[in-house]
Swiss-Prot record:
It is a single-pass membrane protein. This is ATP synthase subunit b. It comes from the Bacteria. F(1)F(0) ATP synthase produces ATP from ADP in the presence of a proton or sodium gradient. F-type ATPases consist of two structural domains, F(1) containing the extramembraneous catalytic core and F(0) containing the membrane proton channel, linked together by a central stalk and a peripheral stalk. During catalysis, ATP synthesis in the catalytic domain of F(1) is coupled via a rotary mechanism of the central stalk subunits to proton translocation. GO terms for molecular function: proton-transporting ATP synthase activity, rotational mechanism; proton-transporting ATPase activity, rotational mechanism. HAMAP family: ATP_synth_b_bprime.
Length: 175
């Protein structure tokens, strides 16, 4: 403790020494001049180059962002056009399918009406043929019956027997 008291009384560490201050300032100025002459230029130029590089990177980033936004806008427009085209194609396909379906339905109806008309005509012709055949058979039966009646004079029992014989003959011919 005694030594620390002596240092404090004789000026010590905290008391300013004008000679030391002067030489410290001179040394600082010399170092500053040397640094300015030797190192300041390269440091400043390096900082300027760094600043230019950063600014260039920022500019490139802005340009890339603008290009990306432009491409995105074009892509959205192309997608919208593609969607519109797809909707148009789908709509046209549905319209075409509806048209084809209605044409096929109409053709089928016309064909079915033709087939029905042809079938009715064929049935009518068969009916006429059957009636003609029936008329001919009835006429033949009437002629044969009249012929038999004329050949024989019949009483009621004989007439019934002749008619039954004729009916049986006709039935046998049909089968």
């Amino acid at each position: 403790m005694l030594t620390s008291g002596i240092i404090l009384l004789s000026g010590g560490l905290l008391s300013p020494n004008p000679g030391l201050i002067f030489w410290t300032a001179v040394t600082f100025v010399i170092v500053l001049v040397i640094l300015k002459k030797i190192a300041w230029g390269p440091i400043v130029s390096m900082l300027e180059e760094r600043e230019k590089g950063i600014q260039s990177a920022i500019d490139r980033a802005h340009t890339a962002k603008e290009e990306a936004e432009s491409i995105l806008k074009k892509n959205k427009e192309m997608l919208a056009k593609a969607d519109a085209e797809a909707d148009k194609i789908i709509r046209e396909g549905k319209e075409y399918a509806d048209k084809v379906r209605s044409e096929l339905t109409e053709k089928a109806q016309v064909e079915s009406q033709k087939m029905i008309a042809a079938a009715k005509e064929e049935i009518e012709q068969e009916k006429r043929r059957a009636l003609d055949v029936l008329r001919n058979e009835v006429a033949d039966m009437a002629v044969k019956g009249a012929e038999k009646i004329i050949r024989t004079t019949l009483d009621a029992d004989k007439q019934k027997a002749v008619v039954n014989d004729m009916i049986n003959e006709m039935a046998a011919k049909r089968n």
